[in-house]
Amino acid sequence: EVSGRQADTCWFEATGDVVQGIRDRARYADLVIVGQYEWQGSPETHPLPIGHSVVVRCGRPVLVVPAAVQLGSLANVAVAWDGSREAVRAVHDALPLLRLARSVRVVTNSPESTENGDDDAESLLTHLCRHGVAVDADVLRLGSAPAHHALRKQIEQGPYDLLVMGGYSHPMWMEFVFGGVTESILLSLKIPVLVSH
């Protein structure tokens, strides 16, 4: 359905700092699409992916598309949900795509009830319905495993056409020492990821 619609798109080439060039042009875009960086070296020497750098600097949603993937139907969508500001932003940035989806699954490691007794993930499903996301929607709880491992495993078991998630940023030395969920997902997933910061 999306491929049949007319969309106003633009392509640009830039010299110099790639991330700065994308950031400067992204201010006037609804969505930025970048390719996943194919790193040939060892995992220990992998630089931050361009997609992550663009996400934390441009203020726009970024669709990171793996090199081996052709965009097709976005019928089955997973939403990585932790209730954070970044996750909320990602969901709202993705609403036009979520409305077109046939199936939306909220993937979370949040408990079934918050301090005020609400189920945060179920509340998100209700919110999505109010915004026209009338789909086969449900919640999958990941349990206590590290977030990026559990999320990656669930997405790989699929079948999903798109992952929507918040993009997190920490000081560079923390990312080097501890790694990061956003970087881990962007480096390893084989489906497009829509990320907002």
Language model regions located:
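Short acidic/Ser/Thr-enriched loop-to-helix initiation segments
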Residues: 44-60, 66-131
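A structural signal for isolated positions on well-ordered beta-strands in alpha/beta enzyme cores
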Residues: 10-12, 78, 103-107, 136, ...
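Well-ordered alpha-helical segments embedded in enzymatic catalytic cores
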Residues: 21, 89-93, 150
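Glycine/small-residue-rich hydrophobic helix-like segments
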Residues: 103-169
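Charged docking surfaces used in two-component/phosphorelay signaling
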Residues: 11-20, 140-147
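A short helix-to-beta-strand connector/capping loop
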Residues: 3-10, 131-136
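Gly/Ser-rich helix-loop-strand patches that form or flank binding pockets
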Residues: 19-70, 154-197
